[in-house]
A protein has these predicted regions:
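Conserved P-loop
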Residues: 1-79
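Hydrophobic residues in beta-strands of the RecA-like P-loop NTPase core, especially within AAA+ ATPase
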Residues: 92-93
Length: 123
């Protein structure tokens, strides 16, 4: 039960955040459980917001370089289990170039251990 990690990259203003928001919209329309992360280093549009000129704003979870992504997801999955929610299927990460090497390793562990697919968007 291994998940996949995909990396979508492009230059600035190439539509990466637009693609992330369109993907999130599609997941929401089809009731596919997902979370969105972005680095707290990117605070151009606000701390917990991803912005696209075409699709507007969407809330996300802002993570600092000291956050442990594996621990965040493990605790989230435990809470889903306790309240009977469907388990997480996808994680979308915006501005992934700002993640630490350790956080990238944590994403790989999340995909391997929990079978969650991850799409990272960045430069």
């Amino acid at each position: 039960m291994h998940g996949k990690i995909l990396f979508k990259y492009g230059t600035m203003s190439s539509g990466k955040s637009l693609h992330l928001l369109a993907t999130a919209h599609n997941f929401q329309q089809h009731s596919i459980p997902f979370l969105i992360f972005k680095s707290s280093i990117d605070d151009r549009d606000g701390k917990d917001v991803i912005h696209s000129r075409a699709l507007g704003d969407r809330e996300c979870i802002s993570v600092s370089p000291t956050h442990n992504l594996y621990k965040i997801i493990a605790e989230y999955l435990d809470s889903c289990f306790l309240i009977g929610e469907e388990t997480l299927k996808w994680i979308l990460v915006d501005e992934c170039q700002f993640l630490t090497e350790k956080q990238v390793e944590e994403l790989a562990a999340i995909a391997d251990k929990f079978g969650i697919n991850i799409i990272c968007y960045g430069l």
